[in-house]
Amino acid sequence: MKLIHKYQMNGFNIVMDVNGGAVHLVDDISYRILDFYEEKTLTKIIELLANEYEKDKVIDAYNELKELENEGLLFSIDEYKDHPSFVNRQPVVKALCLNVAHDCNLKCKYCFAKQGDFGGRAELMPLDIGKKAIDFLIERSGNRRNLEVDFFGGEPLMNWEVVKELVKYGREKEKPAGKNIRFTITTNGVLLDDEKINFINENMHNAVLSLDGRKDVHDGMRPTVNDKGSYDIVVPKFRKLVSQRPKDKYYYVRGTFTRDNLDFSKDVNHFYDLGFELTSIEPVVDDESNPFALRDSDLPMIFKEYEDYAIELAERQLKGEKNKFFHFTIDLNQGPCVIKRITGCGAGNEYVSITPNGDIYPCHQFVGKDEYILGNLNDEEIEIPEEIKSMFREAHVYNKEACQKCWNKFYCSGGCHANAINFNGDIKQPYDLGCQMQKKRTECAIMIQAKLMTQGQ
């Protein structure tokens, strides 16, 4: 299926070739011609635009578009569906989410983990389960060399000694197995101290720091267990960690915006004011029965907020500022591999989550839903049910009706499986509100690149 997407933003006429990935900046006449290009003859297009453009200019612009099409840069065919790397893929486990703590010292109002215990009892992962998880990852990773382990929760710092021992264990096991394990930790920062900061900065390839933005916004959504604000507790610790972080390691400050702060660009700018250059702020995902949940009626304001902030960020980057916003980061020259573009996160096949008692789930969003348990690390033989593996493996953009004609499918890769199931009861029916926001973020990201390429040094 040949697809393009065109839109206008910040003075640019942007045209995307969906299948090939080419992005074009075109003049007004070419932009108008594309309204009719597929369905009308050149003669008819000349007639339709007679009151707007001279005949010769229409012909010239049309011929330029036709040349792009002939070169495979516009209305290109889809070569991914039958690509050998997709058709013949044999996924192996390459990433673990280790829920080392089903407990938390905050009680965030939007928490999908139900304040850390995922709807069960509070518990911490024993060291032996963590070691079995790393063994499982190494054994199931096939020829894959680079592996990922994310210490998650709940709040992983509540099980700090086990985290340290598991890093040590991973380092002991990786070289003999010919692997390279990259560790990540996601933390709310409450328990950070100098010892933990030093260890994280030395051993964690990435650190995800949970902060929602301005003090009133953060404290309103992320109170402590005794209903006090947590902003003043965590911000100084995060600033210290980031100021001491080695340049060869990553971090990002990650927030969540809700209906209470639809002006979330102010929260992102607050991150920058605090000295955090690498940021992300995610839309809350929750049922509309919660007053802070996003609704379709919020989309116009959210779209405007994204677009206004993209224009601002482009200007900042033109001035040499290093601020980066995760959702506006895009590589137009060398993006994700074919499989990643089509299948997304790999949950249930390439990525799994492990709970403190050793249960294996497709990802952390499914923890607590017994029907999605893939096995347990204490089983003598771990045989992940083929039915569940297949369900996730086949949940790619070509099997999702809403994705097949969508221009954004190779950027969002079909969206979040958990959101599809939670909102629609069907892994092949994407969460529409999330789709709409993702489309706007992609448009903004490409506009920023257009601005930098045309006006940068």
Please identify what each model-predicted range represents.
Residues I197-K215, E277-V285:
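Non-cysteine beta-strand/loop elements that form the S-adenosyl-L-methionine
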Residues E52-E67, E71-N198, N203:
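Conserved alpha-helical substructure of the radical SAM core
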